[in-house]
Regions:
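Cysteine-centered metal-binding/redox modules
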Residues: 1-167
């Protein structure tokens, strides 16, 4: 990925848009589309060609594959989010009340880490992502966005918040 693509795949708060199912250029959407194409017609082909030779177990597996493929299609089709870097500041981010996209635009930075005021005391950072915001932007400031992306591109979106809430 180019640096610009990496910047667009990470929110100014440091949360990985890339690993969110809603992100239009994200890994989940890309992989779901690829799997969907591989499975497209597979169910119908097996049911129609082998319908007289299928056991009850085979039919159950085929039905689950069909449901799985419908879910895949739902993951990659339809409207998606362009990520907070493309957000002009008129709305929040993943969390509607988030003021980080607007603040980063006002300060002319891609990431809070790039701002002279970071870490600031503004109340635009939602409580549930404060630790992620702080730690992620410190990492970006010290090591750069490319290393942050490489380190986190396969980690589930909001997993840190989920793990903290379930400890």
């Amino acid at each position: 990925m180019t640096k610009e693509e990496i910047i667009n795949a990470v929110g100014p708060c440091s949360i990985m848009c890339y690993t969110c199912f809603g992100y239009i250029n994200g890994g989940i959407r890309k992989h779901a589309a690829c799997l969907y194409e591989l499975y497209k017609g597979w169910y119908e082909g097996h049911v129609n060609v082998y319908k007289h030779d299928l056991t009850k177990e085979h039919i159950e597996k085929l039905n689950r594959i069909n449901i799985f493929n419908e879910m895949l299609q739902g993951l990659y089709s339809g409207d998606g989010c362009e990520g907070c870097q493309k957000n002009n500041g008129e709305r929040g981010g993943c969390i509607e009340s988030c003021g980080i996209p607007k603040c980063s635009k006002e300060h002319g930075v891609n990431f809070c880490a790039d701002c002279a005021e970071f870490p600031c005391k503004k109340d635009c950072v939602p409580e549930r992502i404060k630790q992620q915001w702080h730690d992620g932007n410190n990492f970006i400031k010290e090591h750069g966005i490319e290393k942050w992306f490489e380190k986190n591109k396969t980690i589930a979106h909001y997993i840190d918040q989920y793990n903290a809430a379930n400890e």
